[in-house]
Amino acid sequence: MYFCVVNVFESKIICKTFQGLEQVLAEELIALQAKNVEVIKRAVVCDYDLEILYKCNIALRTCLKVLVPVFEFESNSPEDLYGFAIRIPWENYLDIHQSFAIDFTIQSEYFKHSQFAALKLKDAICDRFRKLNDDKRPDINTDRPDVLFNLHIHRNQVTISLDSSGTSLHQRGNRVEQTIAPINEVLAAGLILLSKWDKASHFVDAMCGSGTIVIEAASMAINKAPNIDRNYFCFKNWKSYDKSLYNDICTELSLQTKSFPFKIIGSDNNKKAVFVAQQNVKKAGFNHIIEIREVSIQKMIPPLDRGMLIINPPYGERMQTFETDRLYKQIGTAFKEHFTGYTCAIITSDTVALKNIGLKPYKKYSLINGKLDCLYCLYEMYEGSRRKPKEIAAE
């Protein structure tokens, strides 16, 4: 077998995201001064730079994982994959006393069982270490490995990367509890960035659930890097880890935070959701910025003047058709009666019920929430006469 493995380490960084958020992520990378930023499907690529690598993990809001490709080669079978992989110098990237794991994404007629391909790669790594270290090998840890490899196979093209993040970057460490079907933090951040909220006006989520959207909004409002308080990153276990540089970046980003003179309000008519949101806001350290109210969107009285409203109402199997139609009519009424001067946005998979809002969006985006195809619609509620219903006791 002809051995042709190309070492591409420290050439590119791949930042993975959700479908529909690629351009937003690209704009974030450009703001970090990343070089040669290129959008691909569900990811954005840029030139490798150690400082950028650390900043991607700490500061990007719409990034799920930060990968660094290490090896590329062609393979037509699991056995072929093993034959190539056992000759790769894994000892340059993994110490025998460290643990490791393998993530994989495989779309290939040559590898019909994705897990088996990942198993062959794991066997190759372990067998190489056994051969070099008197039958000793690194441990496997699928929960929190020291080093995480990513195996990507498309047809017969194999790319093995180092996953610098470890666990997904949406895990900000803010959740004490969660409600049913909470929105992912990366998607929540994407909704806010797509809305073009200027962070110089009020922000409201009138169906806030566990508070994810308002927490992401508060983080943006004060310019706090989303993962600056996170301790676990796999890059900290790499041989190339520069602790001094990492600490300098954290200090630099910490000094960029600022005050926010406007209001951020989350509300929900579910008592349990309100309690969960309050706990999560407290855990995130945003008690002084975010106010959580127990009130329905129909009775919610937002701050006057202009602002941004983003909601993620229940949809899919969680709602019956008649309930959904009625709810969306109420949402449309609330937009018109209570939120003049605001930009209002809604994400939903129920495009039929969406028509009951009775408004024409000025902007629409196709996104995915979990496994559901969704529309994200934005409405400009121009200044005009505003009804003034009595404020309820809950406020």
Residue ranges with predicted function:
Residues M1-Y2, V6:
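Short, positively charged and aromatic/hydrophobic N-terminal segments
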Residues F9-V147, S164-G166, H170, E177, ...:
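Accessory substrate-recognition/RNA-binding modules or partner subunits associated with SAM-dependent
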Residues E91-I96, H152-I153, P303:
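Short glycine/proline-enriched loop/turn "hinge" motifs that connect secondary-structure elements
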Residues T105, H152-L194:
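Class I S-adenosyl-L-methionine
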Residues I183-P302, E317, D325:
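Conserved S-adenosyl-L-methionine
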Residues R306-N312:
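Short SAM/SAH-binding signature in class I
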Residues L367-R387:
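Helix-rich interaction surfaces within compact, conserved domain-sized segments
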